[in-house]
Amino acid sequence: MIGKWNRLFCCGVALLVLSGEGTMAAAESIEQKVEACAGCHGQDGKPVDKSIPVIWGQQTGYLYIQLRDFKRGDRKNEIMQPIAATFEKDDMLAIAEYFSHKPWPDLGQPRSPKDIAERALTAEHSVGCTGCHLDRFQGDGTVPRLAGQGRDYLAQTMIDFRTRARGNNPGMSDLMIAAPEDDLAALAQYLAGL
């Protein structure tokens, strides 16, 4: 129930941002443009709902690509698509740069128990996550940090890639299809606890 109210709040923030004087395009400074982001992604970088990703401290190139993909319609989300539609390329680059320089928040997620960690590492080895996300899952450039990301967001994102509901990275879909779904749940829990 809390998640539903948080999502409704985020929708309200998005509508406010997109209405009249509050449009993102009309904002004069980067601080004004990113202020609305806090409604969902959190004032302190901790999202208001577990289904919303951490963007503070995320890779600049990755953030830019996601905003671009929301704007193009290559990545679907009823809240983010209308917001991103108001941005020009320079806005998206500035927003990505702004959030990438914020400190990554500690979500207080527990480390995985040994059995979950072992299952997650088996899945990681079969999928090859570290080939792109690097050894400590910190990401680089256009590849996102996964370590410490919200468990629910990670799990849903993996499922969305697996079912091709998220279609802005076909290579990720192929990798997620190759892994057993239970292993992906363990992987999400493991990554969240790093």
Regions inferred by a protein language model and the residue ranges of each:
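C-terminal capping alpha-helices of c-type cytochrome domains
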Residues: 85-108, 152, 177-194
